Amino acid sequence: MKVIKYPAKEEWSEIVERPHLDVSQLNATVQGVLDDVKNHGDEAVKRYEEKFDHAHLASLAVTEAEIEEAEQLVSQELKDALHLAHHNIAAFHQSQKFEGKKVETCAGVTCWQKSVAIEKVGLYIPGGTAPLFSTVLMLATPAKIAGCKEIVLCTPPNKEGKVNPAILMAAKIAGVSKIFKAGGVQAIGAMAYGTKSVPKVYKIFGPGNQFVMAAKQQVSLHDVAIDMPAGPSEVCLIADETANPVFAAADLLSQAEHGFDSQVFFITTSEKVLEDVKKEVEMQLEQLPRKEMAQTSLDNSKFILVKDEEEAIDLCNTYAPEHLIIATADYEQLAEKVVNAGSVFLGNYACESAGDYASGTNHTLPTHGYALAYNGVNLDSYNRKITFQHLTEEGIRNIGDAVVTMAENEQLEAHANAMRLRVKSLK
């Protein structure tokens, strides 16, 4: 980890810069797989499953029998945890329901919005380095609450052609409609274009490696919407002298173990805390099963000493982290100054793990600085707002002349005429 003390503001842009990901070399490979899936459907998906996941599949669909079998394999302890997490996620997202109001913008002109669920959504759940069953809950629960009619889930099988039981259990709890054994680019292509087995969806959600991210971005250009652009996972932790170094180190390592390219950004106003956390990270790292991955991630990370909390929050807002932990005495006041972050964790007891699993907030968040302009997944991610307007004769009298004048000045005569005819009909 790189230690930086009292950096000048002119250095901040370089400090917050993420490792550059050159996906140009991936694009040709990704496009080739997408084209193959588009043209050859299930046959292409099965071929790539055999090539990449070493699974020979007779069928892509997960059966009811497989879901029932998975239910028997999941421990009661994990089932209880999944139900608790689902309850909290549902409660938080239920509170986000939109209530549109009719607004009379002037006499005779009424406007309103209606929230309508996206009918078909696709969820991608990676297999990769860990079975992300928590992401099933995060993506499927709000989709169900929003009222999406079809919730399609794709996830890679193991070599025996089986899907991780916890993923299937989470899918059942959250109300997923259909589950398919497909991973990587081929899964994104199947949901974007549709195959004989996999329905075409209108929007794709979910994390993945560089190939999956490149595939999502490519299909989003023409064929389907996606949740957001994404990069490697990251955390920023702001600490003062009241922070618990043991907790802080654990939080930083929980991010570092996500992947080799994850990033940790630690900002503190206390040199003692910086040194204490640094030592604690080194001690706790030795106990981790994913030590090598966490160590590689820490090599890309920065420990920064700043002069005061105002500078700390300004630097953090410049960084725009996916996760932000504020472990300071006045965390509530600092929280008011956060303008760029995906999800914020306040105080010594609000660890990132809580939000990753069971507090109720969504863990699908903007990374790689995208928090400057994007928010994380929420109920609105699964809805569209359709606007309505109704005009009476009085409304025509009130805005008709203005509409005609504006249309004429934009040299759109047909627009002007559509209103002009209505104005004349009232005279």
Where are these regions (language model features)?
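Conserved NAD(P)+-binding/catalytic subdomain of aldehyde/semialdehyde dehydrogenases
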Residues: G175-Q263
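N-terminal Rossmann-like NAD(P)+-binding subdomain of aldehyde/semialdehyde dehydrogenases
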Residues: M1-E119
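A glycine- and small/hydrophobic-rich beta-loop-beta segment
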Residues: H258, F266-K337, A341
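C-terminal core of ALDH-fold dehydrogenases
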Residues: T318-K427
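Conserved small-residue-rich beta-alpha loop and adjacent elements
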Residues: V103-M169
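Short acidic-hydrophobic, aromatic-tinged amphipathic segments that line or gate anion-handling sites
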Residues: K2-A8, K178-G183, F303-D308
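Flexible, glycine/charged-enriched surface loops at secondary-structure junctions
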Residues: F98-V103, A225, S262-I267, Q287-S297, ...
